[in-house]
């Protein structure tokens, strides 16, 4: 099944104050976030990728053009010829499509549609979130349904509380977001080709197309309480990077057993994740009074860290 990866959004500035890079190219261990997402799909046998590119397209394309299999695989040099003993992407097919800078996700999907061929089913992903969700089960459940799209539904990630306010502005209830019976869109989609007929020019995928289809009962959710983590904040990126460097990556199903301990509303965070989060929290606490940019990012100080 082909996999469309939406990797055309604007870049982000790293903690070290370096230049902006496309979010999918943020390093997680010794490989970009995008590589980890693709490796997850390849683990389940899905190795045809369509990259819907925009901002940072040159960096993304260059990374794969210059890909070095010996960077993370054992190899032999024989009479001057380098021969990797194992490979990561040698059997992948990657199509690179420029879809614009300011383009909404739905429009990006419209622009790569010709590359999907006549396949009845395909998958899509925001290319900036990692999980250990059972992809085979997600696909099987969707294929057996009459839905046009399926999305991974994860517990709320916010640590905030919500309040019930009456007409006199009195608070009648306070609730933790994490305990509410709601789910967030986890960014892992399975779709039928028919969905493409519902895409309108210049519209968003979730906010427009899937919202309308859900009202008609044509969108399926796969609730999942296991490991799921985006890379939207500095804290999240640091946690993912540290887990990868320590070889404790729950999402790396190709090299580690599936982490079956649920994460979310009803279960504690796995120890390896909690340990890293605690360390990052300590750093963030120490930066509480540090100078920040207009967008809230900490301006690094010469602190020796």
Write out the residue ranges for each language-model feature.
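Structural beta-sheet core signal
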Residues: 3-5, 51, 124, 149-152, ...
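A structural signal for short hydrophobic beta-strand segments in well-ordered beta-sheet cores
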Residues: 25, 162-165, 221
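Well-ordered alpha-helical segments embedded in enzymatic catalytic cores
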Residues: 33-36, 108-111, 209
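Conserved beta-loop-beta/alpha segment of the NTase-like Rossmann-fold superfamily
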Residues: 59-167
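Catalytic-core segments of class I nucleotidyltransferases/pyrophosphorylases
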Residues: 120-123, 130-143, 155-158, 170-269, ...
């Amino acid at each position: 099944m082909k996999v469309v990866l939406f990797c055309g959004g604007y870049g982000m500035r790293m903690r070290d104050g370096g230049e902006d890079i496309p979010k999918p190219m943020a390093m997680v261990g010794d490989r970009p976030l995008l590589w980890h997402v693709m490796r997850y799909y390849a683990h389940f046998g899905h190795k045809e990728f369509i990259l819907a590119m925009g901002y940072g397209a040159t960096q993304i394309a260059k990374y794969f053009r210059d890909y070095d299999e010996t960077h993370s695989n054992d190899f032999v040099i024989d009479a001057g010829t380098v021969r990797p003993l194992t490979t990561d992407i040698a059997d992948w097919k990657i199509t690179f499509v420029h879809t614009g800078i300011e383009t909404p996700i739905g429009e990006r999907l419209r622009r790569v549609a010709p590359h999907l061929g006549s396949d009845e089913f395909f998958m899509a992903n925001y290319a900036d979130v990692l999980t250990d969700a059972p992809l085979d089960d997600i696909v099987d459940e969707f294929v057996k349904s009459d839905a046009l799209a399926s999305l991974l539904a994860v517990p709320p990630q916010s640590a905030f509380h919500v309040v019930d306010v009456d007409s006199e502005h009195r608070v009648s209830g306070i609730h933790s977001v994490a305990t509410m019976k709601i789910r967030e869109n986890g960014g892992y989609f399975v779709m039928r080709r028919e969905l493409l007929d519902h895409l309108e020019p210049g519209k968003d995928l979730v906010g427009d197309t899937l919202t309308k289809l859900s009202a008609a009962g044509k969108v399926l959710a796969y609730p999942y309480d296991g490991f799921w983590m985006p890379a939207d904040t500095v804290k999240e990126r640091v946690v993912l990077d540290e887990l990868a460097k320590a070889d404790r990556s729950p999402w790396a199903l190709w090299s580690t057993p599936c982490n079956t301990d649920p994460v979310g509303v009803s279960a504690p965070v796995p120890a390896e994740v909690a340990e890293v989060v605690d360390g990052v929290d300590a750093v963030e606490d120490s930066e509480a009074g540090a100078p920040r940019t207009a967008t809230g990012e900490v301006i690094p100080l010469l602190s020796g860290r």
